[in-house]
Regions:
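Sec-dependent signal peptide cleavage junction
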Residues: 24-30
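Alpha/beta-hydrolase fold nucleophile elbow
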Residues: 145-154
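Gly/Ala-rich beta-loop-alpha elbow adjacent to hydrolase catalytic centers
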Residues: 154-158, 162
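Structural recognition of the beta-strand scaffold that forms the well-ordered cores
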Residues: 56-60, 102-106, 151-152, 181-184, ...
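Short, surface-exposed "cap/lid" segments of acyl-processing enzymes
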Residues: 36-104
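Bacterial N-terminal signal peptides that target proteins for export
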Residues: 3-15
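Surface cap/lid and interfacial helix-loop subdomains adjacent to catalytic sites
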Residues: 129-146, 168-329, 333-337
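Bacterial N-terminal signal peptides
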Residues: 13-24
Length: 337
């Protein structure tokens, strides 16, 4: 028990350092910069990293910019913000880069302060962020893809941006035929979204392709959050047993929770940390075997028991394995054509 308590303290201390990096960004006053030119290498956190891989991943970073009175979107020239952006990308890069050549654009993401606004008032700043993401994606598609299999991936605001790309750019066969899968983790997608965009398909197992993988982790007691407001049902798949119903996965099915630092190095790995099951009412991913006190929300946007910060970390090895499984399924299917 003492050993586990020490691990938890180390993990939480590391995460506290990460979130403290946001503090100076929150108060820095700067006007939002102009649109980036994605033909310039400086506007990419990663551009074609891992040339020997069989596929590409286009990864969209989560929110790291706090926001300021004069700048609700991250200024591209803000070097502290770029350093945090790169660090947050590194924390999730290892899930994908064993299988994929890695692309990750810097973009004028909406600051955390935007999420304090009512939902209908957030859109101008999120729309600006999406302008950059789409421009970067189109540059990649037109200049670098060359028919290669594609994994689309993001977390939190990055997942929101992934879903916007899926709605906007994957309704034609040429683009959708490239898609191995879209890992849009840490944001909601609903039945209404699927009705409005019938070309979208949710994953139904561990190896289907051209699909969306999504979930939002929380304690069993949570009934409302920024990510899944009360009365909303999100669509999800369990990242341990790859079921979409409420069938629980035990902690023994979890090959490893991993907690990387800003370099991407895994500081702590805990096999069998927790199981998970999908709440049939909320569509959230309930995480029963950890304590909210040991894994605090980290941001005032989230109440106790919202495990948003840990969506990738709790299920790191399972997600890493699944990227390879889906890519192999895609390659087999396309080799047979």
């Amino acid at each position: 028990m003492k050993q586990h308590a020490g691990i938890r303290r180390a993990v939480c201390a590391g995460l506290a350092v990460i979130w403290l990096l946001l503090v100076p960004l929150w108060t820095a006053g700067a006007e939002t910069s102009g649109a980036p030119d994605y033909a310039q290498a400086e506007n990419w956190a990663y551009f074609s990293d891992g040339e020997d891989r069989a596929a590409d991943v286009f990864f969209i970073c989560p929110t790291v910019y706090g926001g300021a009175d004069q700048a609700f979107n991250m200024p591209m020239e803000d070097q502290k913000a770029r350093a945090s952006f790169l660090g947050a990308t590194n924390m999730e890069k290892g899930i994908y880069d064993e299988s994929c050549r890695f692309y990750a654009p810097y973009y004028r993401q909406a600051g955390l302060s935007v999420y304090d606004l009512p939902e209908e008032e957030r859109e101008p700043w999120l729309a600006l962020a999406y302008e950059d993401v789409k421009a970067a994606f189109m540059y990649y598609l037109e200049n670098r893809n060359d028919g290669r299999p594609l994994v689309l991936a993001g977390f939190s605001q990055g997942a929101d941006m992934c879903l916007r790309l899926m709605k906007d750019c994957f309704d034609d066969e040429a683009t959708s035929g490239l898609l191995v899968a879209c890992y849009a983790i840490g944001w909601r997608i609903t039945e209404e979204d699927l009705r409005q965009y019938p070309h979208l398909r949710m994953a139904s197992g561990e190896d289907d392709t051209g699909v969306i993988i999504s979930f939002n982790s929380e304690a069993e007691s949570v009934q409302d959050s920024l990510l899944i407001p009360a009365g909303t049902r999100s669509l999800a798949i369990n990242p341990l047993n790859w079921r979409t119903d409420a069938t629980p996965a035990s902690r023994q099915e979890n090959p490893g929770a991993c907690f990387p630092d800003y370099s991407g190095e895994i500081v702590t790995e805990i096999p069998h940390l927790t199981g998970a099951y999908i709440d049939p009412v909320r569509g959230s991913l309930k995480v029963p075997d950890v304590s909210p006190a040991d894994y605090p929300p980290g941001l005032s946007l989230f109440s106790e028991g919202v495990y948003h910060l840990y969506d990738y970390q709790f299920f790191y090895r399972s997600l890493q394995e699944n990227v390879a499984v889906r890519l192999n399924a895609y390659l087999r299917a396309h080799a047979a054509r």
